Amino acid sequence: MYTIEKLKGLFASGKIGRRDFIQGAVALGATISAATSMSSSVMASPKKGGTLRLAMSSGTTTDILDMSVSTGATSELVHGYAIYNNIVEVAADGSVVPELAETMETDDAKTWRFKVRKGVEWHNGKSLDVNDMMASVNYHRGDDSKSSIKGQLAEIADVRADGDYLVIELEGPNSDFPVMLSDYHAPVQIGDSNGKLKDPLAGIGTAGYVLKEFNPGVSASFTRNPNYWKAGHAHFDGIETTIVSDATARQQALMTDQVDCIDDV
C-alpha cells in the first residue's frame, strides 16, 4: 500500500510525474493545495548521486575547450559550463553578481575592482589568484588575440593587480561592462608566471565538474569536483555527453533508457 513518503520517493526518483504524485496524495487524504505544496518541496530538494547521460545534437571534431573561440554549439556550452566559472555571472533575476570575484565595485563605471574569491581551487589543486583573473581578461586583448569577444572588450584601457583585487580601467564609463565578463567566451582559466594563460585547451577549471575524457565531436565524461566552492550545486556524481546528430536516434536513445535527456527535440 502506498504512503505519502512512498509517493515522495517515487516522485523524487522520477518514477512518477508531478500529476501522478498530486493525484496519489489526494487519494491518500491530502488536500490539493497540500499535495501541490509537497510536490514543490520534493522538486526543490535535489537528490545527489548518479550519472547524467546527455545526448546532444550539435558537436563536431573541431569542438575545443578554449571558450574564447567557441561557436556557441550546444556541446561546447555544456562542456564549458561544466568546467569553468567566470569573474561574474548573471543571476536568475537578470542582475550581474560576483562569481569568482567575491565583490565587485566601481565609483565611476570606468574603474572596476573585483576582489578574488578566497578558498577556490582549480581542478588540479592550485588556488585561484589574481594573476589567473588578469591573464584571463588579457587573453581577449591585443593584436594576437583570436577571441570572439575581442571587439567588445576593446574598451579596456588597462588591466592590473592591486593586492587581491583585479582592477580594470576602461576608456570611458560603462555601467554595463561586467555583463561582458559573464559571457561564455570569457571564463577564468589558469595563468602562468608571464601573465598569459597556461593552456587554454587543457580544460582545467574551477566549476562543478572535472574533465575526465574528451573526444571532440564524439563524447566527453566528467566527474564531480569534490572541492567545488559553490554550495548547492553539482549534484550528479558524473556527466557523460554523447553527440547524436540524428533526431530520431536521439529520441530512440531516450526512449530505450540509453540516455537521460536530449536536446533539440
Range-by-range predicted roles:
Residues 1-20, 29:
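N-terminal secretory signal peptides
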Residues 15, 36-60:
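C-terminal segment of N-terminal export signals and the immediately downstream linker at the start
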Residues 49-59, 111-114, 133-136, 166-168, ...:
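Short, well-ordered beta-strand elements
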Residues 55-107, 138, 204-206:
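N-terminal lobe/hinge region of extracytoplasmic solute-binding protein
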Residues 92-95, 182-240, 246-248:
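Gly/Pro-rich hinge or "lid" segments in bacterial periplasmic/extracellular proteins
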Residues 102-146, 167, 253-256:
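Aromatic- and charge-enriched surface segment that lines or borders ligand/interaction sites
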Residues 105, 149-191:
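Surface-exposed binding/hinge segments that line
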